[in-house]
UniProtKB/Swiss-Prot annotation:
Gene name of this polypeptide: lacZ
Positions of Na(+) binding: D198, F599, N602
Pfam families with a match to the protein in the record: Bgal_small_N, Glyco_hydro_2, Glyco_hydro_2_C, Glyco_hydro_2_N, LacZ_4
Protein name: Beta-galactosidase
Cofactor: Mg(2+); Na(+)
Subunit structure: Homotetramer.
Residues the entry annotates as binding Mg(2+) 2: N595
Entry EC no(s): 3.2.1.23
Keyword Chaperone: no
Annotated site, Transition state stabilizer, chain positions: H355, H389
MF annotations from Gene Ontology: beta-galactosidase activity; carbohydrate binding; magnesium ion binding
Amino acid sequence: MRNFSDILLSQDWQNPHIVKWHCRTPHVPLHSYRTEQEARLDVGGNRQSLNGQWRFALFEKPEAVEPAVIDPDFDDSAWAHIPVPSNWQMQGFDKPIYTNIQYPFADRPPYVPQDNPTGCYRHRFTLEKQALTESIRIVFDGVNSAFHLWCNGHWVGYSQDSRLPAEFELTPYLQEGENLLVAMVLRWSDGSYLEDQDMWWLSGIFRDVYLYRKPILAIEDFFIRTELDALYQHAELRVETRLSQVTRHHQVQVALFDAQGECVARSQALHTGQRVVDEKGAWHDKTEHSLAICSPTLWSDEAPYLYRCVICLLDEDGAPIEFESAAVGFRKVEITQGLLKLNGQPLLIRGVNRHEHHPELGHVMDEASMRRDIELMKQHNFNAVRTAHYPNHPRWYELCDEYGLYVVDEANLETHGQFPMSRLSNDPQWVNAYLQRMIGMVERDKNHPCVIIWSLGNESGIGTNHHAMYQWTKQRDPSRPVQYEGGGANTAATDIVCPMYARVDQHQPHPAVPKYALKNWISLPQENRPLILCEYAHAMGNSLGAFYKYWQAFREFPRLQGGFIWDWVDQGISKWDSEGRHYWGYGGDFGDTINDRQFCINGLLFPDRTPHPALHEVKKVQQPYQFSLSYPKLTIHNERLFAALPLELVVSVLCDGQEIKQERLPLDIAPRGTITLDLASLPMLPEHEYHLNAVLLCREDQPWSNAGHCIASEQWCLQPRRSMLPKITHAPLPQWQQDGDKVRIEAANQQWQFNRQTGLLEQWWQNGQPVLSEPLRDNFYRAVLDNDIGTSEAQHLDPNSWIARWHAAGLDKLRVECDDLRVTTLNESVEVVIDVAHYHQQALALRTRWRYQIFGDARVELNVEVMLCSDLPPLPRVGLTLALPVAENPVSWFGRGPHENYPDRLQSAHVGRYTATVDELHTPYIFPSENGLRCDTRQLQVGALVVEGHFHFSLSRYSQTMLDKAKHSNELVAGDKWYLNLDAQHMGVGGDDSWSQSVHPEFLLTQPHYQYQLTLRVKASSPQ
């Protein structure tokens, strides 16, 4: 046995050749049921959870640990209690560190820092004498990053790879009654060089720990395969079982049960060694069963029907010793004709990358959180998930089997911080570490029907070690494709071309790893593989512009079979400031000086699983039903491949945003089917705007939603709004007067005051009450988005980023001068024309001309012209901004909504009439930025102020300046005014990625001249 000092001297955690000591061979999760009924129902078994409160102490390095901590008599009463599972940084020990690419320590593989925080855990448990007659194993489902284990003072073994089980045989070290476990967990190990995965660096025993008992001769592993015939009608169930010892006398029997618990098939009991494999004979610790299954119900994401396979080990007399079982889904994954297919049908992957993240627990995932994630995915039309970038909690796969979600299962491997990235991937010293990460994942997860693709890892370049992983995997499991993006996404180590952030129509040249436009990639010579983006549509902050273009391409080109959005959830950690205000922390907020700021904040959901507005866009764009309208004929095509959903169709007609007619009818559309309906036509008055809405609802409850859930929708404009003749007013002509620099106009109990020096409408009164809190001003800037910042740092702006170009042009700090203000009395109005010049330093940047026409009924017609006078970059926005007193009534508008939308992200935002509070109009992005826009607005009412025209608006308690300065949401402090932005044009948000200029050309504001018109009025009283 190794003593403590030997372990410290050996430094196993800095030796790439050593990844395990005394760990059991990887295998599927085992339960050792003792009856067939237990195995069939997946209840009982012989597991004993060790989760709970353990004693814990943190040391600055392993050498600082007292050798006596492993002794049963050591007094740990002064140690803290810590929950297992947990990350110790989330329990107040040490600090979380976030980096994207760079290692948070000196890059000298395999060596790690001498100051290496080391957590020591002690836990006592009891065993009865009867338990000691069997083999007792302990399983740690996840420990970061490496650990040594002792039991009752005896060294048991060592393990690294934080995302796979470490299993040890404890039997030799156990005793009747009380037993002691001691785990010494190191924050850093040579394995950390392989786990550089754009996430928080957190440590500890963060997944379940349990004991389980097995007979001395027992079922050690089993591999279930389902093979379908050429017509996908009948199947063969193949089960390979491995025992813990060689035996010629024991037998194995296999039975299959359907979802109702009825036995579908039962095999004969077979001895080991039935098939000779080479000149030395057969495997006498293995059996191979084959059962013919007639017309099984097939498994898919749409109809995840599960059987249960029960495996029984029989003794020499035919009596059962133990049982193991697993869920079985009959399905066939294959690549034929350049297409990834399931059960013969080409898949369209509606996928997302998901990190395991909890805002209070770190990397600890409970079942409720996992179920919530899956239900949200299904509700938003996802059918696939990539376990970015490591094997997930074992329960995750069971839930994906159950709910129906395709999984790309990814090895715990990323060396993004290496130079070059492939350095370790080509080093034979590391080949075993690479292989063991792949082997452990495949062996653990091989029986899950949800796993349709294996992944070799992420962002590690390409090297000989990857090819070894690929070859082993294809030999072990030929039934699934293997993918890997590294080295250019189309190497010999991938069955699927799986690029990240390739664009639909734009090549991204690179001397080593070019990214071709998607439409061109699939037409390259000799390239006949399917293309599925392993990452695309970088959802960082206010993002996902032009997402719909990807889906236009996916639907047009069959070999473009979808992709996985980056990513699912913002990796923010809950924090509270000194005033007790909650906010989400990111890199640098915990004293982590090496960090990548908010680059961990790029999810479709906030950390608490509240959806971002962009999630609505994703749901709409990838919805599995497609609509077309040739009024009054409505055609609906079902993109689902395997199972029809009972639906209810709701068709409504809107006149000027108000629903005037609705029809509802039950609907059933066969998979891949199309139906056409005749709608009742409706007479339309020429002076009104009409829209048709079609919404498909789930008619019945689903495992992932209630009846009434909207699964798809579409809107068409039946008749656009027509230009109206100028309104004729019969009210008395407004009166105006000048007093020094002030020009005051009066009409209908309202007054307007202009300042000749500034050119501003300083105030507007109604019955003596001020309408404005701040004047109307030109607005050409926005609080920068993450996509505007790109790769910029606080002290160094990326010169190609939008923020750098806008700041260089002075758009955030233009000096404004009024050149002229003229007042003219017209037939029905008083006209005020103001010429304004905008300077950056001494250079003229823009000119604007504001033309107010104030009518006798107190209506204000505003016309603004914008003329660019210098070589400016595309503008963030063209419009005006003002501030209003806080109002009590909800805001109402006629335009796109109800959620936030932008010119390149509005497919999901239908035109209608909506109401919301000012807080509901604000999107609290973790890194504050421009937010809350509602596009194509015809009418807006805020308090008593009514705005009409065609514009985009946002209303917030916070100004653009406040948003631009804040780094966290708690830094935003509301005052006594609301800030209203009225935009004629607004640049897109982009989102193909977040580090280059990703706004598509048609969503850039590049014209030299803009003009817009608005009508403003104040209602006599606010609506009830």
